[in-house]
Amino acid sequence: MARPHIEPFCDRDEHFKPMRLLGFGTGMHYKMLSMDTDTGACSMTVQFDGGYKRTPGFSWSEYEFIVIEGELKVGDRTCRTGHYFYVPAGYALPEISSDQGCLVLYMYNTGEPSHEEATEHHPSAQTQLYHDVDSYMDIPWAAGNVAKPSVASGCMIKLLNYNPNSFAMTFLYCMTPNFYQDIISYHDCAEESYHLWGTSWMMQFGYVPTGGYFWRP
């Protein structure tokens, strides 16, 4: 079945489990946020231990990740809190490592987590779709009214990715102080949210703290 409705949920209430899938090495731990039991697609918060290394390679699933805390080295670059990556299926990343350890949000969108050791992209990879950005420093906040009808004023977004295959969008959002919206809304697509920082209040579900998550089919 597809991913079930998950709400309310806070990953701070769960313990990390060791990642034991082939190719990911040792020193990677995860908290499962949601999973499609048919395809293996899932979202996880991941803790890399200090000294963690993963060989160059690609995944059979497209995936996205953003650094929540600490520093992650991708090849010879050091990526800090807020750095976001969209990685198409078959796109080979260089070695990743973390000297001091870091916390990362991972979203495998089309299949289960996998790592195929390689220094070249798969021939079918849509390499032109790959991108990464320091979302905290290099993208300005914009009004959240990307669709009509829209959210109330005071909800701001930073668009991180638009997927031309699925039309899915990934963005950061923030609620400014005293933001308030008292209407119930729904979407014609699945909706997923993870609280990187701060606390909000979600109607019948109450307060959602840092680490709060939902998946709405």
Tell where the protein language model's regions lie, with residue ranges.
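A short, N-terminal "cap"/entry segment at the start of jelly-roll beta-barrel domains
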Residues: 1-38, 112-167
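Short coil/loop residues immediately preceding or within conserved phosphate-binding loops
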Residues: 28, 43, 62, 155, ...
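Ligand-binding loop in jelly-roll beta-barrel domains
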Residues: 28, 78-79, 89-118, 189, ...
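Active-site-flanking structural segment that lines cofactor/substrate pockets
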Residues: 29-31, 37-54
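Residues at beta-strand starts and edge strands
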Residues: 40-42, 61, 66, 100, ...
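Short, flexible domain-boundary/linker segments around small modular repeats
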Residues: 41-50, 156, 164-180
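Glycine- and acidic-residue-biased ligand/ion/polar-headgroup-sensing regions
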Residues: 49-52, 58-74, 175-205, 209-210
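Short acidic-glycine-tyrosine-enriched beta hairpin
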Residues: 73-94, 201-217
